[in-house]
Amino acid sequence: MKEDPYLDVKKRLAREAAALVTSGMLVGLGSGSTSREFIKAIAERLAKENLDICAVASSQESYSLASSLGIPLIDDENFTSVDLVVDGADEIDPQLRMIKGGGGAIFREKILLQSSQRRLILADESKSVKVLGKFGLPVEISPYGRSSIIAALEAIGYLGNLRKNSRGGFFITNNGNYIYDIHTPNIYPHPEEDLLKLLQIHGIIEVGFVIANVEVWFGYTNGQICKENTGIV
């Protein structure tokens, strides 16, 4: 496996984010490589400190890692509010609008973001882009009527492919749905407009755009961490 050139940056971001966690918190665990480092950093604190927390995970992968490291997890059906969610992103533009869902967990990730009192996105410098869309836009779609949903997408100019897994079959999300990766268009200067158009298609479960009140911490290979906030109410 190719070594991640930003692994040290992700670890540094994760440790600083883990320092925000205090006893009594319910913590939302995102998905992806940066979130994995955050989960590990939380586990390190639990091993060294008398920290009383619970967590809820946005994906089976994050759940399994947290469970294996001894992080207490709650029933993911019954939480109403999360104190802090820490997650990553695939792309972030200058307005801190972002694309998430490269790992296929966008539906659950957005529920956690919606439920959280504080939303923190950790990103290395490679995730900062001038315009969203270069690496594609993941859309979670229903298996029922799959072909008709894709036809509706194509009819309004959104072209792509169903995501495949490592065995060559269709990638299935933790919710039993498909991921359709849109590659055309490949730039989204006004993602709010695209989000509204896409959500009008019945059968689209969730779209990878995140336009919300979030904090974003950008980590750089020179050791700097730049902390920004959308300022959206």
Curated annotation (Swiss-Prot):
Keywords: Isomerase. It comes from the Bacteria. NCBIfam families: PRK00702.1, rpiA. It catalyses: aldehydo-D-ribose 5-phosphate = D-ribulose 5-phosphate. Belongs to the ribose 5-phosphate isomerase family. Gene3D superfamilies: 3.30.70.260, 3.40.50.1360. Homodimer. Catalyzes the reversible conversion of ribose-5-phosphate to ribulose 5-phosphate. PANTHER family: RIBOSE-5-PHOSPHATE ISOMERASE. GO terms for biological process: D-ribose metabolic process; pentose-phosphate shunt, non-oxidative branch. This is Ribose-5-phosphate isomerase A. Pathway: Carbohydrate degradation; pentose phosphate pathway; D-ribose 5-phosphate from D-ribulose 5-phosphate (non-oxidative stage): step 1/1. The lineage of its organism: Bacteria, Pseudomonadati, Chlamydiota, Chlamydiia, Chlamydiales. The active site is at 109 (proton acceptor). It is an enzyme of class 5 (isomerase). Substrate binds at residues 31-34, 87-90, 100-103, 127. Its EC number is 5.3.1.6. One of its GO terms (cellular component) is cytosol. GO terms for molecular function: ribose-5-phosphate isomerase activity.
